[in-house]
């Protein structure tokens, strides 16, 4: 454990010195490019904890530390992929990430849930309700694979819920994911929503609709 705490301290001091403007919500995840950042050493220390300790034997400090590292690894997503091989660890950290400040860990757990074959797939219903837009979007995509019978209902809800302002980035990308999920599950409502997409002034949504049409012709 001490190795993990030590590497996080070294990395955090480096990050505060070189990128003081970055935060949990404003983090591009490209820490692997940092010279002398100890990013890789920190990640290795996190993996060592996962491999050497049982998830039910660690305290909140360790859990918080692991979530911190997973969030920093949001560009490569290596640690969360390793966690898919450890059911208990994955489920523990996934649940702890819900609504936490570690938004860049939360969406990774939503995205990779299907790769953790023994994990409780119903966790996806928590992720899809996340207040963090990107987490909910990743969860909808994962739901298409894990719970296809539910995916159509959620995709349509995402399209129509009006959670984000009309014309916003968030609203457009929620609709893009909804459209792609309807296509993925071969929904009978796909054509209806392709027509809706064409009638909106969203450049990337229209482009996605055109690609979907081309793929099914």
For the regions a protein language model found, what residue spans apply to each?
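Extended amphipathic alpha-helical repeat scaffolds
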Residues: 1-40, 217
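Alpha-helical scaffold domains
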Residues: 3-13, 17, 100, 104-105, ...
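Generic structural signal for well-ordered, non-membrane alpha-helices
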Residues: 9, 13, 44, 85-88
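A general structural signal for well-ordered secondary-structure junctions
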Residues: 14-17, 21, 76, 89, ...
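Surface-exposed polar/charged interaction patches
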Residues: 14-17, 21, 52, 56, ...
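Structural detector for internal amphipathic alpha-helices that build alpha-solenoid repeat scaffolds
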Residues: 29-53, 64-85, 104-117, 136-149, ...
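Amphipathic alpha-helical scaffolding segments comprising HEAT/armadillo-like alpha-solenoid repeats
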Residues: 50-64, 85-99, 117-129, 148-164, ...
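Short inter-helical turns and helix N-cap capping residues of alpha-solenoid HEAT/ARM repeat scaffolds
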Residues: 101-102, 131-134, 162-163, 170-171, ...
């Amino acid at each position: 454990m001490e190795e993990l705490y030590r590497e996080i301290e070294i990395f955090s001091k480096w990050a505060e010195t070189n990128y003081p403007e970055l935060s949990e919500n404003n983090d591009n995840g490209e820490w692997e490019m940092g010279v002398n950042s100890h990013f890789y050493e920190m990640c290795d220390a996190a993996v060592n904890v996962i491999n050497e300790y049982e998830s039910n034997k660690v305290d909140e400090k360790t859990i918080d530390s692991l979530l911190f590292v997973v969030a920093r690894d949001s560009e490569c997503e290596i640690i969360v992929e390793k966690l898919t091989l450890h059911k208990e660890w994955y489920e523990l950290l996934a649940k702890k990430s819900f609504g936490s400040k570690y938004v860049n860990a939360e969406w990774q757990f939503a995205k990779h849930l299907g790769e953790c074959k023994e994990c409780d797939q119903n966790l996806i219903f928590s992720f899809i309700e996340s207040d963090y837009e990107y987490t909910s979007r990743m969860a909808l995509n994962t739901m298409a694979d894990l719970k296809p019978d539910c995916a159509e209902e959620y995709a349509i809800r995402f399209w129509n819920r009006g959670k984000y302002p009309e014309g916003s980035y968030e609203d457009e990308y929620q609709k893009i994911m909804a459209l792609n999920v309807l296509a993925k599950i071969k929904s009978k409502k796909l054509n209806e929503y392709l027509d809706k997409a064409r009638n909106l002034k969203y450049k990337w949504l229209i482009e996605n609709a055109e690609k979907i049409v081309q793929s099914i012709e």
